[in-house]
Regions:
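Proline- and Ser/Thr-rich low-complexity, intrinsically disordered segments
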Residues: 1-148
Length: 148
């Protein structure tokens, strides 16, 4: 409590007033973070990507819709998720963000089989797989490299 005093001139007495100061802590939404996950990974808590954040805030998804804070990479979108901690006046609210990257799992295709003659022409094995994405590597029986 702070006291303000004005001295009076005799015969008047001094006069005092007081001011009580109530301090409110400002919110801390933490330091921004990032999560990189696979679309087939288990759900994870966005809060764990923030450093030093206070609990009790709210999450919004990319586009601004409310979000639970539990990222399900099979259904949620990649992008920026915002964590907001509201403040009590005169403090201002604080925000942090988690940048989410969701990768698609690799697809080596569906297993296949082929019968070849031991003296026949070379066979391109990649064509024996169904739905395989390009860019993989082949390994021969015994572990050696193979061009496919």
């Amino acid at each position: 409590m702070y006291t303000y005093t004005v001295n009076g001139t005799a015969p008047c007495a001094a006069d005092q007033s007081t001011v009580t100061v109530n301090e409110t802590s400002s919110p801390n939404a933490g330091t921004d973070g990032a999560i990189t996950t696979c679309s087939t990974s288990a759900p994870s808590n966005l809060f764990t990507a923030l450093t030093g954040a206070q609990a009790g805030g709210t999450w919004t998804a990319p586009g601004g819709a409310a979000h639970s804070g539990t990222l399900d990479p099979s259904t949620d979108a990649a992008g920026i998720y915002v964590y907001t901690l509201n403040a009590t006046a005169p403090c201002v609210s604080d925000q942090s963000q988690v940048t989410v990257t969701i990768n698609t799992p690799p697809n080596a295709g569906t297993d296949g089989s082929v019968t070849v003659c031991d003296v026949g022409a070379p066979t391109a094995l990649f064509g024996e797989l169904t739905g395989a994405q390009a860019g993989g590597t082949w390994t021969a029986p015994g572990g050696g490299a193979f061009s496919g």
